[in-house]
């Protein structure tokens, strides 16, 4: 009976409908009600009586909080199998072929620059308009090429283009700045500038092997680049603020 009450309460209170698996288990000689709810794509799920804005909650560490506006938008897009970066940019009404070609050249140049093996550099293929469409950077709508939010980010034309903020602090706290820099422009350019900034600020040593000297940074440079790139690639651009 209790299981039916819990199941019906969840079904009646939530929207879209949630179908929980409610069971009884024995733990330390006590009967425990276990409620299992599998992840589902129809996000967001909210308390029906409170509405989608006030009734959507998220878990933050060990607390339950009302969802923030940007996160609610993100959940709605995910529930529709859509993503912010692949949405058509609302304030870039058109894009010209010369702008697309420049972005394609710039992106290929970045790939070649970060490819160490010479044979691999020669194997790098051209990036074309069709490739950008496949990636979701551009969209073909009834024969018209439209820019997405990803295109705006890659060309530095986002309405509130986020920036990367880098700083060096004195000691082990963030109370005093020794140096601070802010990098704007296209996101891929920001990654490169932030990477070079970190290399300027960390110590470099050397390793002698035989008659050869190899310069070595105190931190692994591949890890630094990946850390910065991941911060840019995996952040939510619906969330206001910088990196």
Region locations from a protein language model:
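Conserved N-terminal catalytic/coupling substructures associated with nucleotide/phosphate chemistry
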Residues: 1-243
């Amino acid at each position: 009976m209790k299981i039916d009450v819990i199941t019906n309460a969840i079904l009646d209170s939530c929207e879209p409908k949630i179908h929980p698996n409610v069971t009884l288990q024995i733990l330390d000689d006590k009967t425990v009600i276990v409620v299992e709810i599998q992840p589902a794509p129809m996000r967001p799920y909210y308390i029906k009586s409170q509405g989608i804005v006030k009734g959507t909650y998220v878990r933050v560490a060990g607390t339950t909080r009302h969802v923030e506006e940007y996160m609610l938008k993100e959940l709605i897009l995910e529930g529709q199998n859509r993503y912010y970066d692949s949405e058509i940019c609302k304030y870039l009404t058109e894009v010209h072929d010369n702008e697309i070609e420049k972005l394609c050249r710039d992106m290929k140049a970045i790939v070649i620059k970060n490819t160490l093996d010479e044979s691999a550099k020669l194997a790098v293929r051209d990036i074309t308009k069709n490739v950008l469409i496949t990636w979701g950077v551009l969209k073909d709508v009834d024969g018209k090429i439209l820019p997405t939010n990803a295109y705006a980010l890659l060309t530095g034309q986002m309405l509130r283009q986020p920036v990367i903020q880098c700083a060096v602090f004195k000691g082990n706290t963030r109370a005093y700045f020794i140096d601070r820099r802010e990098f704007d422009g296209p996101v891929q350019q920001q990654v490169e500038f932030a990477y070079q900034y970190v290399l300027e600020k960390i110590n470099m040593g050397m390793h002698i092997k035989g008659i050869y000297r190899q310069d070595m940074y105190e931190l692994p440079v591949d890890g630094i680049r990946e850390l910065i790139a991941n911060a840019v690639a995996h952040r939510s651009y619906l969330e206001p603020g910088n990196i």
